[in-house]
């Protein structure tokens, strides 16, 4: 058949599966996508029109210019009867789009169980992967919270512990979304509760990252290990970060809102009740994208809570047995970080008022305002870094050294005069005046580090 012949037949409405472009009401040829009348009928779930087109000789496997079949469109809408009509007419359940997307993946994403069952009964491949990310139908079901679809797919041979090209699993998809029913369905189907992402992150930590605290408790109840730290830190460390991220200073980027009934403080108790070590030491630095100046190697959850002056968590961890005097590998104490050592102005969480209260708490616990860490930083360096006048005066009243010079060659006065990390030079004129009046001195200002 020549192109000109097709044009004539189109004008007469005589090509099976195609209709006149002008007949908008009857399921037309889409000149952009080249959808056929069969595509339109499948998309609407219009079984009568679908059957009429097939009876007229329409090819059940015809694709539009994007490689999409009528079967995939029927699966998108969850039109079970239309799916069965197409399969009976010979539609290929494994015909994939250009990106490797199969009808079963589409049906799993939509979540209609009968659609999935119909495809599987006609030979749909449950382990097929799309070519972009290497995802399977089971992953799509998990990512869309379709717990009812999990069992049929796994029973048909879907890989419950399969991984995407980047190492994500169905369980991790469901955990990231916090859907307990889907997580339970995957675990009941054989998903490995102790699996990790390639960097060692456990499902428990993924739940905590996303503030899915109800799910975190559920994972603990099912046997998740609260001491797991293959990625370099535990769920308890993660909870401190999730509760008060670096960008929380001015509430422009608030913490994730917990989903469900379990609060973050209740989760702290649950983690410890299930065996979490309140004095666990961090072994790696996270690549979380937040600006951080503290060496977190050897940091405990308590030290991290002190860094963001989260007094509620600090006190709770103390009640649960935390040692408040443990330091990081630089010898930086909880009092030092609470005072402001390693803060990033306007981004580090916590107010100056909270910092003062936290410093007083640490003094009650035996920490000292005269401690100097291995970087030469003192509590007074920290209080000036965070611009806390009342805190600075309190520290001086308690005996803090006025003009100690750290390893960078900075005294507290140097910082008040505007020398700071990287390309950030923030000056604190009021503190500069206070320090000068008390006799503070400053060494010659060094070049800013490159």
Segments the model singles out, each with a brief description of its role:
Residues 31, 64, 97, 130-131, ...:
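Ankyrin repeat boundary/linker residues
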Residues 21-37, 189, 222, 241, ...:
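Ankyrin-repeat-protein effector appendages
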Residues 34, 67, 100, 133-134, ...:
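Start-of-repeat signature of ankyrin repeats
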Residues 54-59, 84-92, 117-125, 151-159, ...:
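Ankyrin repeat domain, specifically the short helix-to-loop turn at the C-terminus of the second helix
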Residues 40-44, 73-79, 106-112, 140-146, ...:
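Ankyrin repeat A-helix N-terminal signature
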Residues 2-17:
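Bacterial N-terminal signal peptides
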Residues 49, 81-82, 114-115, 148-149, ...:
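Conserved ankyrin/ankyrin-like repeat signature
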Residues 27-66, 70:
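N-terminal segments that cap or nucleate solenoid repeat domains
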């Amino acid at each position: 058949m020549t192109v000109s012949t097709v044009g004539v037949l189109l004008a007469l409405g005589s090509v099976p599966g195609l209709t006149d472009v002008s007949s908008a009401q009857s399921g037309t040829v889409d000149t952009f996508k080249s959808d056929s009348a069969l595509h339109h009928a499948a998309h609407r779930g219009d079984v009568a029109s679908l059957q009429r087109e097939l009876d007229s000789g329409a090819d059940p496997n015809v694709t539009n210019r994007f490689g999409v079949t009528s079967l995939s469109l029927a699966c998108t809408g969850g039109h079970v009867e239309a799916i069965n009509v197409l399969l009976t007419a010979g539609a290929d359940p494994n015909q994939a789009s250009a990106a490797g997307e199969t009808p079963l993946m589409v049906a799993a994403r939509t979540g209609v169980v009968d659609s999935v069952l119909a495809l599987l009964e006609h030979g749909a491949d449950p382990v097929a992967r799309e070519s972009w990310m290497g995802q399977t139908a089971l992953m799509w079901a998990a990512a869309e919270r379709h717990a009812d679809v999990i069992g049929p797919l796994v029973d048909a041979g879907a890989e419950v512990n399969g991984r995407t090209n980047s190492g994500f699993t169905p369980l991790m998809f469901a955990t990231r979304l916090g859907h307990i029913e889907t997580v339970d369905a995957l675990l009941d189907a054989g998903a490995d509760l102790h699996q990790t992402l390639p960097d060692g992150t456990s499902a428990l930590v993924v739940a905590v990252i996303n503030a899915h605290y109800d799910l975190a408790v559920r994972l603990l109840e099912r046997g998740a290990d609260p001491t797991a730290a293959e990625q370099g830190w535990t769920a308890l460390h993660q909870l401190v970060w999730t509760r008060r991220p670096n960008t929380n200073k001015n509430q422009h980027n608030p913490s994730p809102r917990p989903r469900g009934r379990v609060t973050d403080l209740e989760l702290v108790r649950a983690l410890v009740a299930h065996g979490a070590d309140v004095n666990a030491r961090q072994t790696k630095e996270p690549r979380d994208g937040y600006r951080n100046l503290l060496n977190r190697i050897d940091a405990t959850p308590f030290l991290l809570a002190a860094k963001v002056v989260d007094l509620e968590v600090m006190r709770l961890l103390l009640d649960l047995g935390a040692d408040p005097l443990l330091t990081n590998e630089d010898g930086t104490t909880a009092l030092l970080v609470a005072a402001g050592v390693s803060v990033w102005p306007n981004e580090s969480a916590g107010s100056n008022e909270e910092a003062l209260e936290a410093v007083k708490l640490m003094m009650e616990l035996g920490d000292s305002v005269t401690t100097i860490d291995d970087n030469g930083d003192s509590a007074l360096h920290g209080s000036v870094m965070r611009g806390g006048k009342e805190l600075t005066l309190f520290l001086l009243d308690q005996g803090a050294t006025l003009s100690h010079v750290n390893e960078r060659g900075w005294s507290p006065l140097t910082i008040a005069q505007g020398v700071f990390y990287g390309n950030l030079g923030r000056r604190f004129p009021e503190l500069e005046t206070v320090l000068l009046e008390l006799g503070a001195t400053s060494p010659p200002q060094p070049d800013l580090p490159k």
